[in-house]
From Swiss-Prot:
Coiled-coil segments: 51-87
Domain of life: Eukaryota
PROSITE patterns attached to this UniProt entry: G_PATCH
Modified positions (Phosphoserine) in chain numbering: S141
Protein name: G patch domain-containing protein 11
Gene (UniProt): GPATCH11
Taxonomic lineage: Eukaryota, Metazoa, Chordata, Craniata, Vertebrata
Pfam family, one: G-patch
């Protein structure tokens, strides 16, 4: 009886132990942010800072080592030949050179120009060693084409500038001609107005020519037919504004002793010729 009871008790204890162990395992799998283990992990951040400094220091040493290796790198045969050639070209020939000694015997002096007149070159012709894979004359051809292209571009720019200057000059001439034409028309209207006033003062009721007087902008219906006839006569006149101004100016000076640019009616011809600069607008500038 006792053995059976103890056996059952042992089995119950074993089940309890297994259940308790299982519960502890489940609790361990869940994160406890208030546990010491989690706090210790957070506090382990500080030891990482020295590690970063060590990494940076290692990288700095590696870079210095690479620079030192680059400086101490053995030069290639091509680089050594280039250096020796440059040094040799920079140094002048000495008396130990047979060719130079022969030139000295012939009267040549160091630093003297070649040629009988002494107008030749002083420095030797530089060596241009070809290093590319292109054919002979290819680089010169490319250079010539580039120069031709540049020259063509310059010519186009020059022609464009000339065309722009010509267009600007033509515009200025047209503007000047327009201004001159407007000035002539203004002088002609002033002459017509003065001619009409002076003719009326002398009881001249009809102008010598229809265009000697200004035309009225508003006329009565009774004068419509006469206006049309006058317009036909006016249009038949084949005279420019300048020609009309010259004719009317001459009429005013001879008939009324008047100059529109002076704005004065003179006493006689002698007074007119003595005090008036001339019969044109340019004479009064």
């Amino acid at each position: 009886m006792r053995s059976a009871r103890s056996t059952a008790l042992n089995r119950g204890e074993q089940r309890a132990v297994r259940y308790y162990s299982h519960m502890k395992l489940n609790m361990a799998e869940e994160e406890d942010y208030m546990s010491d283990s989690f706090i210790n992990v957070q506090e382990d951040i500080r030891p990482g800072l020295p590690m970063l400094r060590q990494i940076r220091e290692a990288r700095r040493k590696e870079e210095k080592q690479q620079e030192a290796n680059l400086k101490n790198r053995q030069k290639s045969l091509k680089e050594e030949e280039q250096e020796r050639r440059d040094i040799g070209l920079k140094n002048a020939l000495g008396c130990e050179n047979k060719g130079f000694a022969l030139l000295q015997k012939m009267g040549y002096k160091s630093g003297q120009a070649l040629g009988k007149s002494g107008g030749g070159i002083v420095e030797p012709i530089p060596l241009n060693i070809k290093t590319g894979k292109s054919g002979i004359g290819h680089e010169a051809s490319l250079k010539r084409k580039a120069e031709e292209k540049l020259e063509s571009y310059r010519k186009k720019i020059h022609m464009k500038n000339q065309a722009e200057e010509k267009a600007a000059e033509q515009f200025r001439m047209r503007l000047k001609n327009k201004q001159d034409e407007m000035k002539l028309e203004g002088d002609l209207r002033r002459s017509q107005r003065a001619c009409q006033q002076l003719d009326v003062q002398k009881n001249i009721q009809v102008p010598r020519e229809a265009w000697y007087w200004l035309r009225l902008e508003e006329e009565t219906e009774e004068d419509e037919e006469e206006k049309e006839q006058d317009e036909d006569e006016y249009k038949s006149e084949d005279l420019s504004v300048l020609e009309k101004l010259q004719i009317l100016t001459s009429y005013l000076r001879e008939e009324h002793l008047y100059c529109i640019w002076c704005g004065t009616a003179y006493e006689d011809k002698e007074d007119l010729s003595s005090n008036c600069p001339g019969p044109t607008s340019a004479d009064h500038d």
